[in-house]
Amino acid sequence: MMPAKLQLDVLRTLQSSARHGTQTLKNSNFLERFHKDRIVFCLPFFPALFFVPVQKVLQHLCLRFTQVAPYFIIQLFDLPSRHAENLAPLLASCRIQYTNCFSSSSNGQVPSIISLYLRVDLSPFYAKKFQIPYRVPMIWLDVFQVFFVFLVISQHSLHS
């Protein structure tokens, strides 16, 4: 079981990330996932390929969650395969698993757990952190994310 202090540290980190990504996490939703020993990030990278250096974003996430590696498996969804291959050692070092929602996973099914949906791909926070021009209107981010979630649910329905 994760120590209580570490639980609070992780919760604060996630809440901070969520605020920067314009989405607030509820304590109850997050704490439910402690019993699963799993944190899942659903990052819609497909609209972000030309806007965000994926490697820098992932390195930032890895650094923030290295301390929870003994307690959690952290999954990233829909990471372009070329980035996944290049970052395999980095992801493995933090027990971060990569799953592509648009191809068959190891067990032939699209994972159904999407517990934490952080808007970190094109958020103003990451744009500022990595000196990326933030030119995408927020309305389009919402459209992309709704579309992405719809695709994930559709893919999961097809496989079940």
Curated annotation (Swiss-Prot):
It comes from the Eukaryota. Keywords: Membrane, Transmembrane, Transmembrane helix. Its main location: membrane. The chain crosses the membrane at residues 39-59, 136-156. It is a multi-pass membrane protein. It is found in: Membrane. The keyword Ribonucleoprotein does not apply. One of its GO terms (cellular component) is membrane. The keyword Transmembrane helix applies. Belongs to the UPF0479 family. Completely overlaps YHR219W. This is Putative UPF0479 protein YHR219C-A. It comes from Saccharomyces cerevisiae (strain ATCC 204508 / S288c).
